C-alpha cells in the first residue's frame, strides 16, 4: 500500500475510538494544520482539513469548517449542525446558535428550538439566557426546561447579570431577582442606584447602595456578611472573596470566613475554585482550602479555570498549579496556554502543542 494511502487510513481509523471515549476534550491545531483533540493520552483527529474558527469548553467544541458549516464535537462524535451563517456560543456543557432570528441550542446530544424571535443570548455552564422579541421577554433555559423570567414593557434589553448557574435580573418596577435552580428570589427594589452584582456558581454577592452592607446570596439564602463598606468583591464556585477597607482579604464559604491576607494587596482575582493574590511581591493562591505560595514574583500573564492556575514563569516559560500542586510544564518562552478541565494546553511557536494531564506531559 502506498505511504500516502496508508497515512489516511490511519487517520480515518483514528476516528473509531472517538465514538466510545469521552473524558473531556483539549482542542488545538497540529503542525499539519489539522484540527485535533487530546483525549486519553493521545491527540486524535477531529478534522483533517483547516477550520475557520472554534469555541470550546471542557466537554464540547463547536467550530466552523472550511466550507462554512457549523459542527460540534463532544469527545464521542462529530455532529453536523448547519450549513448556514450563524452566531454561536459555547460553555463547558452547552452550545447555542442563532440563524437570523431563530435561536437553537444543543445539550447532551439533543437539539432544542428556544425561539424563532431571538436576539441577544448568553451561554453559561448550566443555563442559557436569551431575549424573545415576540413577547418582549427575557427567558432562561435550565435543566432541559425553558422559562420566562420577565416581560419588559419599556423596551427589551439584555438587562441581566449571568453566572454559571444563576441569573440576576430586574423587572419593570426596578425590583431585582435571583434565578437559581429553577426558583426566583427577590433581592430588593433600587431605582437610580448602580449595583455591582458579582456572580459565580451557587453564590452571588453585592453591596447595598443604601446601607453599604455587603450581602451574599448563598444557595438560596441571603447573608449580611459585612455591615460596613468594603472595597472589592468577587464570586467563585460556592464561595466569595472580598477586600475590606483596611486591605484585608477574606474568603467566605459555607458560613465560614477565612482570612487570606492581612496585607494590602495590589492585585487579586477569583475564578471557579481558585483565588490568587499578590502579597509583598509574592504570588499566592488559595486552593483546596490551603494557602499556597506560588512564586516570588508577579507573573506577567496567568489564567484561572476550575482548580487550575497556569502562568508565565520568571524565565518566560509555562508553569501551573493543578489541584494545589505546582508543576513546571515547559521552558519555551511566550507560548500560548489554555485550560480544559484539569488539563493545561500549551501551544508552542513551532506549531506543536503540549498537554499537561494527570501529572504527565504529552506532546504531538
Please report, for each region that a protein language model flagged, where it lies by residue.
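Surface-exposed, polar helix/loop patches in the mature regions of secreted/periplasmic/lumenal proteins
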Residues: 90-127, 131-134
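Boundary at the C-terminal end of the N-terminal hydrophobic targeting segment
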Residues: 20-22
Amino acid at each position: 500500500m502506498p505511504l500516502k494511502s496508508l497515512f489516511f487510513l490511519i487517520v480515518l481509523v483514528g476516528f473509531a475510538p472517538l465514538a466510545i471515549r469521552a473524558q473531556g476534550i483539549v482542542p488545538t491545531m497540529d503542525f499539519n494544520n489539522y484540527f485535533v483533540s487530546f483525549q486519553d493520552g493521545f491527540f486524535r483527529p477531529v478534522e483533517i482539513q483547516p477550520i475557520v474558527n472554534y469555541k470550546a469548553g471542557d466537554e464540547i467544541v463547536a467550530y466552523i469548517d472550511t466550507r462554512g458549516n457549523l459542527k460540534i464535537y463532544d469527545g464521542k462524535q462529530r455532529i453536523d449542525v448547519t450549513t448556514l451563517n450563524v452566531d454561536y456560543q459555547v460553555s463547558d456543557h452547552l452550545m447555542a446558535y442563532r440563524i437570523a432570528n431563530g435561536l437553537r441550542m444543543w445539550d447532551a446530544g439533543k437539539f432544542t428550538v428556544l425561539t424563532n424571535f431571538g436576539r441577544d443570548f448568553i451561554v453559561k455552564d448550566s443555563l442559557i439566557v436569551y431575549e424573545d422579541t415576540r413577547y418582549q421577554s427575557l427567558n432562561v433555559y435550565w435543566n432541559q426546561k425553558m422559562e420566562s423570567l420577565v416581560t419588559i414593557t419599556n423596551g427589551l434589553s439584555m438587562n441581566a447579570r449571568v453566572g454559571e448557574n444563576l441569573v440576576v435580573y430586574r423587572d419593570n418596577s426596578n425590583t431585582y431577582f435571583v434565578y437559581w435552580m429553577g426558583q426566583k428570589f427577590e433581592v430588593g427594589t433600587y431605582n437610580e442606584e448602580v449595583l455591582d452584582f458579582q456572580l459565580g456558581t451557587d453564590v452571588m454577592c453585592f453591596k447595598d447602595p443604601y446601607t453599604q452592607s455587603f450581602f451574599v446570596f448563598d444557595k438560596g439564602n441571603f447573608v449580611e456578611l459585612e455591615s460596613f463598606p468594603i472595597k472589592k468583591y468577587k464570586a467563585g464556585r460556592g464561595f466569595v472573596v472580598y477586600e475590606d477597607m483596611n486591605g484585608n482579604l477574606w474568603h467566605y464559604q459555607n458560613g465560614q470566613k477565612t482570612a487570606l491576607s492581612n496585607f494590602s494587596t495590589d492585585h487579586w482575582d477569583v475564578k471557579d475554585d481558585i483565588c490568587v493574590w499578590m502579597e509583598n511581591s509574592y504570588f499566592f493562591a488559595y486552593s483546596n482550602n490551603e494557602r499556597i505560595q506560588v512564586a516570588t514574583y508577579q507573573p506577567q500573564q496567568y489564567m484561572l479555570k476550575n482548580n487550575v492556575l497556569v502562568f508565565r514563569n520568571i524565565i518566560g516559560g509555562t508553569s501551573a498549579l493543578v489541584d494545589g500542586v505546582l508543576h513546571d510544564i515547559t521552558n519555551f518562552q511566550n507560548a500560548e496556554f489554555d485550560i480544559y478541565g484539569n488539563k493545561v494546553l500549551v501551544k508552542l511557536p513551532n506549531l506543536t502543542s503540549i498537554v499537561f494531564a494527570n501529572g504527565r506531559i504529552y506532546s504531538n
